Amino acid sequence: MKRSLWALVAVAVGIGWAVSPAAGAAPAQNQPGGSPNSDIGVTADTIRIAVIADVDNPVQPGLFQGTVNGVQAFAKYINGHGKLAGRNVQVDFIDSHLSADEARNAVIRACQEDFAMVGTNALFFNNVQPMEQCVDQVGQMTGLPDVPTLQTETPHQCSQISFAIIAAAIDCATVNDHPQTYSARVGQILYYKKQNKDLHGIWVLPSDLKSTINSTTPVATGDTKAGVKQDQDFFKISGLATQSDYTPVAATIKQHNSTYAQSISDYKSSLNLRKESKIQGVSSVKVWDCALQCYDAKFLSQGGADVDGQYASLFFIPFEEAKQNKSVDAFLTAIGGKGKADGFAAQAWTAGLFFRDVVNNVVKADGNNGLTRARFIEEARKIHDFTAAVGGQGMLGPTDVGAHKLNGCFVLTQVKGGKYVRVFPKEKGTLNCDSKNVTTIKLDQT
């Protein structure tokens, strides 16, 4: 399981003020009505939010520390830029320890102490009952608002009080259908096809968990629908596999003179694939594909020259372009520099900004003392073009978070000389958001 964990992030990717006109913290308001202690986790001077994440665990210590760092960076930014609803944001980190029981206990604790969950990143969050049946300050079963970084289980993905910036691939209305309907990002595939007429190849999926297989299969299937032909059935390889376990994959690439190859697992899987392919003398591949998991300093340092040419498609403006984007710049400043930033932290930052926008919308309508969980959930459902903006510049393309719709916006980078270089679209600080970047597929994964 250890190395397959990044696969869940690879799937989720292919990572603004949405309703009110401002893009920062809301100014203090003194509208009548309500109480300074308007709901659980809200006092006259503080809004408490919980970040539940798998960090301390024996499998991969520090796994989602980036998520915690990202939420804390958000709070640091907000508290230094006008606060939120006239209050400071306090982050309560609750470790879920890669455990379903710990995740459940963490949600129960957050229900009792915090206004909402932000940046949730617990792989075994498979019981949403404590979240959905959480009672508010007046005893109503409102539910505990959730703005997660990652959702791996269908009940969490389809919860009506959970608002993921990266929407789940599954169409929740089809969960009980046979087959189910999924959305897949294919913008990068459309770009590759314009550059290479005949793409055919292989995909590696992580085999350790049913959830990783179910999450990655729609991604690979979407690629084939977009026009990359399969040379072999999808390879399913354990996240604990070593480089030698990729010998059959490299042999298949060589046998078919494959022009396309992608591992939809963690960055180490892509490293093993590239290194073993080099040993086997593979020379036919035109597109070594990858997503957010390969946008990592460790991928560059451990891969060296062996990963030159690797593509990494992102759904946010790259860190290298902080000068072109105020949200990226604010994120990197708050977290302590590019060296401390990673994909998990960036996603958590955008989750925090969504929380900010929803709170600001509540405050605009009801005043600082009108902030309740029920109103938060109501306003969250109305946001359909979230961009994670700071100073009017969004880190994301317009995203329909309120309706749980997948965003097809992307930027394609490529490793060149040990650095990530923007490939498409050419202009820095931009994303490609063509409607053709998302396709639908049908799979029965029950």
Predicted regions span which residues?
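Extracytoplasmic "Venus flytrap"
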Residues: 34-46, 50-72, 205-214, 340-347
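Extracellular/periplasmic periplasmic-binding protein-like sensory domains
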Residues: 166-172, 178, 276-349, 427-432, ...
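Immediate post-signal peptide segment of exported/extracytoplasmic ligand-binding proteins
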Residues: 27-50, 85-88, 192-200
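N-terminal export and membrane-targeting signals
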Residues: 1-11
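Extracytoplasmic ligand/sensor domains, especially the bilobed periplasmic-binding protein
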Residues: 114-231, 285-312
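Beta-alpha junction/loop-to-helix N-cap segments that form part of ligand/metal-binding clefts
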Residues: 31, 35, 62-69, 81-163, ...
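Segments of small-molecule ligand-sensing domains
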Residues: 335-345, 356-423
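C-terminal region of N-terminal signal peptides and the immediate post-cleavage residues
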Residues: 15-32
